[in-house]
């Protein structure tokens, strides 16, 4: 009986692990990221980029998957007003990587997603000979569990982003009223 219980537990863990994907992996299905998303956390090695008046404090509303690109519908807050912005991110020659021009040249990947709950993105911005990185945690719902947030914080640390540069936006004005 114990052996059967251990086998079931092991298979459950394998199935949960198999559900996660990375845009650079073979099992990534870009079609499954199509739809509505909410910005939960932003992190950057240049914190000012994601602070209240930072150019990269963007709130994702939707990803629309096309054949070789993604249309990203985002909102930004300027002078307490929500503005909508759409960007087209094109596939690059690297597997699972997309590029978009916004305040410089950006490339990004999706290191982790389970499609149904969360998506973790890693972006590198190049502008005027300088670079910085940004990571975002996005959810299908307006907030995510503390476990997923902690996994995201660990991924940020793996990319050299300090915990003090991680901003939880689940209680910030994310232009949710503009989504209707």
Swiss-Prot record:
InterPro entries referenced in this protein's UniProt entry, alphabetically: Calycin, Lipocalin, Lipocalin_CS, Lipocln_cytosolic_FA-bd_dom, Maj_urinary
Compartment annotation: Secreted
Any one Gene Ontology molecular-function term assigned to this protein's record: small molecule binding
Record keywords, A-Z: Disulfide bond, Pheromone-binding, Secreted, Signal, Transport
Tissues where this protein is expressed: Because of their involvement in the coordination of social behavior, Mup proteins are thought to exhibit variable expression depending upon gender, age and status of the studied individuals. Expression may also be strain-specific: in strains C57BL/6J and 129S7, transcriptional support is lacking for Mup17.
Disulphides: 82-175
GO cellular component, one term: extracellular region
Family: Belongs to the calycin superfamily. Lipocalin family.
Its biological purpose: Major urinary proteins (Mups) bind pheromones, thus stabilize them and allow slow release into the air from urine marks. May protect pheromones from oxidation. May also act as pheromones themselves. In this context, they play a role in the regulation of social behaviors, such as aggression, mating, pup-suckling, territory establishment and dominance.
Protein name: Major urinary protein 17
Recorded name of the encoding gene: Mup17
């Amino acid at each position: 009986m114990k052996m059967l219980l251990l086998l079931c537990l092991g298979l459950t863990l394998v199935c949960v692990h198999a559900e996660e994907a990375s845009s650079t992996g073979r099992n990534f299905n870009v079609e499954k990221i199509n739809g509505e998303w909410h910005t939960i956390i932003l992190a950057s090695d240049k914190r000012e980029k994601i602070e209240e008046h930072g150019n990269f404090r963007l709130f994702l509303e939707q990803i629309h998957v096309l054949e070789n690109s993604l249309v990203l519908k985002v909102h930004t807050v300027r002078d307490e007003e929500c503005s909508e912005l759409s960007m087209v991110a094109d596939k690059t020659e690297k597997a699972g990587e997309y590029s978009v021009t916004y305040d410089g040249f950006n490339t990004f990947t999706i290191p982790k997603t389970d499609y149904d709950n969360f998506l973790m993105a890693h972006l590198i911005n190049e502008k005027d000979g300088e670079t910085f990185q940004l990571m975002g945690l996005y959810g299908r719902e307006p907030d995510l569990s503390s476990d997923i947030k902690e996994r995201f914080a660990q991924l940020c640390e793996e990319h050299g982003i300090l915990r003090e540069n991680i901003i939880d936006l689940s209680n910030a004005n994310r232009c949710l009223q503009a989504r209707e």
